[in-house]
Amino acid sequence: MTTQVDFWFDPTCPWAWMTSRWILEVEKVRDVKVTFHTMSLYILNEGRDLDPGYRERIDATLVASRAAAAVQKLHGHDVLRDFYTALGTRIHPGGEPVTVETVAAALADCGLEAGIAERVTTDEFDTDLRAYQKVAQDLVGTDVGTPVIRVNGMALFLSLI
């Protein structure tokens, strides 16, 4: 029987990135089906008293999570998986900054419409992003980060540190 793994990620989180690469390797050698879902460190940390430097970094993540939410809404989870790989590869091993330009390049890598990149500077996809975030938070609470992983209905926050 196939094990269903649901994986919530913020595209900018290095811990989620490393864990996502691991679970995709697991999927190659085990009877596992991974479905990726968007979440947002920006939304998770809204209203919290954070160190100013950390707040600045968190605020910069919003364009990436909005882009992922847009892809999830417009194209579904399979395309989101490919977009996360494209964007994550640019950000994490690639060292590219989290910008609209990096989002646009990742969209192009996936053959997706460039117009999405222009829309991530608006709040157009925020309602969707908040709904995706709420699902993750309802599973594990608000005192966690990313990734959130649900395996056959049992959810956890996976911290690598």
Residue ranges of each PLM-predicted region?
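C-terminal cap of thioredoxin/glutaredoxin-like
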Residues: 22-26, 100-161
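Structural alpha/beta surface segment adjacent to cysteine/selenocysteine redox centers
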Residues: 17-103
